[in-house]
Amino acid sequence: MKPASRLFYLSLFALWSPEAQCKSDESCAISPKAIVSDACASYSTLEQLNRDIKPALEDLTRTTDFFSHYRLNLFNKECPFWNDENGMCGNIACAVETLDNEEDIPEVWRAKELGKLEGPRAKHPGKSVQKEEPKRPLQGKLGEDVGESCVVEYDDECDDRDYCVPDDEGASSKGDYVSLLRNPERFTGYAGDGAKQVWDAIYRENCFQKSSFPKSASLGDTYSVPKNPAAQDFRAVMQAAGRQHMLEQQREQNPLVPFVTKTGLESEDECLEKRVFYKIVSGMHASISTHLCWDFLNQTTGQWQPNLSCYINRLHKFPERISNLYFNYALLTRAVAKLGPYLSSHEEYTFCTGDPAQDADTRAKVLAVTSKAANTVPGPVFDESIMFKNGEGPSLKEDFRNRFRNISRLMDCVGCDKCRLWGKLQTAGYGTALKVLFEFANNDTSATSSETDEIPFKLKRTELVALFNTYARLSSSLDAIQKFRAMVEESEEGQQPQSHEQIEGSENSGAHHIPDRAKKPRHVIVPTPDAADHAEASDTNTATTAVDEAKAAGVTPAPKVEHQQQVEVDNNDDDDDDDEFHEFQRQPQQPDTDPNFVYKKRTLKDDFENEFRAVFAAFKLVIRSYLNLPALIYEITITELKRFWQFYVGLPVMPRTWEFRRPSLDEL
């Protein structure tokens, strides 16, 4: 009974604990010193690491022919999951061309043009051409200044340990070589049902199901008592409370956010391997969204510029997405660092077979990146050695690999050429990182020499290009996220002084808080005409002096009131409860349009009619409330039944739409 009682008290204390006071939800979720979930480094550590690596990484991917060109089968594959004609409503012929303002946009800025690939393309040469022209197998189709021996891929063999589907597998065409510099990842206008269908398939059709081997976690392992069970129970309780709180906040902003019980991916109580899978997908999505928001085309002016509202709506309001982006950066940093020793020597890997000078230059730039990734931060930023270690490890790894291959296949369903290019490249990059982390031997004494020797030849050129370019994309995402965050802070700080000055201005002008009772409608009893004439005669000199002073100061005086009357002061309060009482308030006499109007003395008949109208209006109000009572009780009953059902099945309970409260003094 000890664990049960301990868990009960831990749960009780966790639920009673007050929420942390933060400036915003984002500052609580992403603190610089906080450790990224399931990684081994803090947010500030990864940001500092990115500042050190980013210059060398950009130099590698932008100035070398090997890493600036990519080979893929972009046009000769069909979507294997649904019919393109029915499923690609986000394509140029459906969701893009039918936009109302598409015709008003210059043709060069339209989504159809933005999605096209730019620059020269070259077909993959056959083996005979490769033998006849080893130095120029592409025959100059990519340009005379491109080192073709650094671009052409000579190994077309596939590996069953791949985490993505090679583009050349089972295809009639060997693919095209395209320039990544001429086709940057940025806004293309690709949106609509087609894009949503692809992401829905990635998130929902590739989610893990419940374990097929619920008791297999202990297979092959000796039984041992878990260490610190109280700490583990407390950690589980705190994580569950935090997830539930975050889920409720998300569903308040967007009711379409899926529940954790439906997806099975977001849940932290799943095993580490399943959490890593979901974080990779979510982080990739966040990275793509960051690039689209940072390099956004203003289709009115034709300028490429950051879109702050795009960032706020897609990322800033969802700190877990940004956290997953940081996790992906840590994962790829570990893969690049682990790959460094295998690319260090010329005997292990050759980048440019026909150009030793370019080969040496490319190797030096690659090693500059891998050395910074391995040595900038003490210790690994991600520990892959703890994954796939229990009894279910082999089957779970195979399931992990197959589901990531499904994501690779889904990229053929994207209807935009540039989007499909970068989608294929980044899924291949993440697949290569997973292959390096989970299939390659670690650099320890347990790794045999045979394992170490065979590893480099399992990586094809496309895998290396995809890995380092995906790493560069994540690096740019982290840099853009920090700049966007600074822009948000500047915009918030820019609004704060204005409101502060307004508050100070109201205080200096003598404005005070007006109680609610003083805001209610009042009757102002105006003196009789004789008294008014007497007051006017006695104050003539004072009024004349005030008018002269006002004119001298440049202020237009208010017009003189000829006939004062009994009026009702109403501040147009927004209280709806007061509005329904206005109909039976005593109405004062209204003057005629005659300028010589004289107030008549109220008679007994006038008082009786006025009181009768007020009593009749109050009677109608009471009867109406009784008639509405059954419908009100029915609505309250339905609401409470819904709340009970949500509580019973474990869903977030919606707030009440009604309440019991005592009437205030003003209402009485």
Curated annotation (Swiss-Prot):
Binding site for FAD: 186, 188, 199, 282, 285, 314
One GO CC term, this protein: endoplasmic reticulum membrane
Residue stretches of biased makeup (Polar residues): 494-509
Region (Disordered): 116-142, 488-519, 554-597
Annotated catalytic residues: 416 (nucleophile), 419
Glycan attachment sites: 298, 307, 406, 443
GO biological process entries: protein folding in endoplasmic reticulum
Main enzyme class: oxidoreductase
Membrane topology: Peripheral membrane protein
MF GO annotations: FAD binding; protein-disulfide reductase activity; thiol oxidase activity
Signal peptide: 1-22
InterPro entries linked: Ero1, ERO1-like_sf
Cofactors (names): FAD
S-S pairs: 79-413, 89-94, 150-352, 416-419
Family: Belongs to the EROs family.
Protein name: Endoplasmic reticulum oxidoreductin-1
Protein's organism: Neurospora crassa (strain ATCC 24698 / 74-OR23-1A / CBS 708.71 / DSM 1257 / FGSC 987)
Encoding gene (name): ero-1
